[in-house]
C-alpha cells in the first residue's frame, strides 16, 4: 500500500489454459470437466518490495594487500544480507565474532593508537567505518562509535569507526518503522556498503568536516530534494 507502506504477504496462485479448457468444454458438451491447474509463485518477494531504495551508501578504496583484502572480504560477507527490523539493534563485534585464524582472518596492518602494526583481522576497521558512514546517511541511530586516534586515509576525516574485540564496538539501532538491509562487498579495489530500505524522506543528507588544530568537527546537513536547499 503506497499510503501506509504496508506489504500484503505474497501467496501462490493458480492458472490454467483458457483456450484449451474452452475447447474441451465444447467437445464434451458438459460443464463438468477436469482442467489441469498450474501453481504459480509470486514474481516479487516481500523482501524485494521492502529493499528497493538505497538509503545510505559508502564506497572507499582499499590498498592492494592480499591478507588485508581477505579480512575485508570476510567482514563484508558477515554483514551482507543482514536485516534489521524496526527497533532492532546491531553490534559489529557480535555480528563478526572474534577475529581468529580459524575463521580465516589474516595478520595485516592495523592501527594501534597512532602506529600501524600487523594484527589478526587488520583492515576490518575499514569495513566498520564504511558501514558507519553509510548508516549515518541512512539515519540509523548510532548507539556506540569510537574514531581512531589518528586520521585514516580511506574515509573522510572524523567519519571513521574503530573496532576492537572486547573493547570498542560499532552499535546502531533501526528506529524507523520499516526494516533495512545491509548489502556489503569488497571487490575491484573498493569496499561497498549500502543500507537498503524504503525511502520516505523528502531530503538528502550531506556530511562535511572541518579541521582545527588537532581536532576534527563533522557536520550533517539536510537538503530538500525538490529545491536542493
Show where each model-derived region lies.
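Well-ordered beta-sheet/strand-loop patches within structured domains
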Residues: 1-229
Amino acid at each position: 500500500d503506497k499510503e501506509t507502506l504496508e506489504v500484503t504477504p505474497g501467496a501462490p496462485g493458480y492458472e490454467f489454459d483458457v483456450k484449451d479448457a474452452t475447447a474441451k468444454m465444447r467437445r464434451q458438451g458438459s460443464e463438468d470437466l477436469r482442467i489441469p491447474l498450474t501453481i504459480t509463485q509470486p514474481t516479487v518477494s516481500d523482501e524485494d518490495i521492502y529493499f528497493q531504495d538505497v538509503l545510505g551508501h559508502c564506497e572507499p578504496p582499499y590498498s592492494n594487500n592480499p591478507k588485508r583484502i581477505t579480512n575485508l572480504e570476510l567482514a563484508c560477507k558477515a554483514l551482507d544480507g543482514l536485516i534489521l527490523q524496526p527497533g532492532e539493534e546491531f553490534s559489529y563485534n557480535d555480528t563478526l565474532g572474534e577475529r581468529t585464524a580459524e575463521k580465516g582472518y589474516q595478520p595485516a596492518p592495523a592501527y594501534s593508537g597512532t602506529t600501524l602494526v600487523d594484527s589478526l583481522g587488520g583492515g576490518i576497521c575499514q569495513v566498520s567505518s564504511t558501514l558507519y558512514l553509510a548508516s549515518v546517511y541512512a539515519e540509523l541511530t548510532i548507539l556506540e562509535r569510537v574514531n581512531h586516534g589518528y586520521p585514516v586515509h580511506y574515509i573522510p576525516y572524523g567519519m571513521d569507526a574503530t573496532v576492537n574485540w572486547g573493547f570498542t564496538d560499532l552499535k546502531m539501532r533501526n528506529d524507523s518503522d520499516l526494516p533495512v538491509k545491509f548489502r556489503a562487498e569488497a571487490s575491484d579495489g573498493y569496499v561497498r556498503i549500502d543500507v537498503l530500505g524504503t525511502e520516505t524522506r523528502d531530503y538528502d543528507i550531506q556530511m562535511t568536516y572541518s579541521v582545527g588544530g588537532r581536532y576534527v568537527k563533522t557536520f550533517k546537513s539536510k537538503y530538500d530534494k525538490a529545491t536542493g536547499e
